[in-house]
């Protein structure tokens, strides 16, 4: 490649990156440079289950137990094959996000809080699903990071498909 052409490409690329970065920084609501970690909630006292500002927050086992006992909707983000091992009582599951979104909206609407979980701390499916559902208009999503592993190893109630 010709050195003059290479310098021109490098210059144009550099100017483009600089303009994009400047615009993003100066713009209201620009894209964050680093991902913000989810807010962690350690008590049901800190949770409002009816909000209208989009929010995805992380909860621990104790909070998940309290919410489940109070009838909060749980969504299992694991693939259907994993449900044979059991799931949190009352949890719903559907690998089709459109159908799942419709089911959640029918059951609780868009502003009431619900919990999403997957297999364990390392499973990203619950977060991915939470952000997907947020795009559908759900405002108050709680992610139980410990997931199925923490729940089942704690000896809590388990439900099985019949």
Model features per residue range: what roles?
Residues 155-162:
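Active-site neighborhoods of enzymes that stabilize oxyanions during catalysis
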Residues 100, 105-151:
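Catalytic cysteine-centered active loop of the rhodanese-like fold, especially the PTP/DSP P-loop
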Residues 72, 138-139, 156:
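Short phosphate-binding/catalytic loops that engage adenosine nucleotides
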Residues 2-73, 80-85:
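Flexible, polar/low-complexity N-terminal or interdomain linker segments that lie immediately upstream
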Residues 59, 95-102:
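A short, well-structured beta->alpha microelement
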Residues 65, 69-98, 110-118:
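Mid-length scaffold segments of soluble, non-membrane domains
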């Amino acid at each position: 490649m010709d050195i003059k052409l290479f310098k021109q490409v490098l210059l144009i690329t550099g100017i483009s990156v600089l303009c994009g970065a400047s615009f993003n920084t100066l713009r209201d609501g620009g894209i964050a440079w680093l991902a913000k970690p989810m807010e962690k909630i350690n008590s049901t006292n800190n949770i409002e289950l009816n909000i209208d500002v989009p929010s995805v927050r992380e909860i621990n086992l104790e909070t998940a137990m309290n919410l489940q006992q109070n009838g909060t909707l749980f969504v299992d983000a694991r693939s259907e094959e994993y449900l044979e091992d059991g799931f949190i009582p009352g949890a719903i599951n559907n690998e089709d996000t459109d159908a799942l979104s419709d089911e959640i909206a029918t059951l609780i609407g868009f502003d009431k809080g619900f919990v999403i979980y997957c297999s364990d701390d390392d499973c990203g499916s619950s977060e991915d699903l939470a952000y997907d559902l947020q795009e559908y208009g759900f405002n108050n999503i709680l992610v139980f990071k410990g997931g199925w592993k923490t729940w089942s190893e704690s000896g809590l109630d388990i439900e099985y498909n019949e």
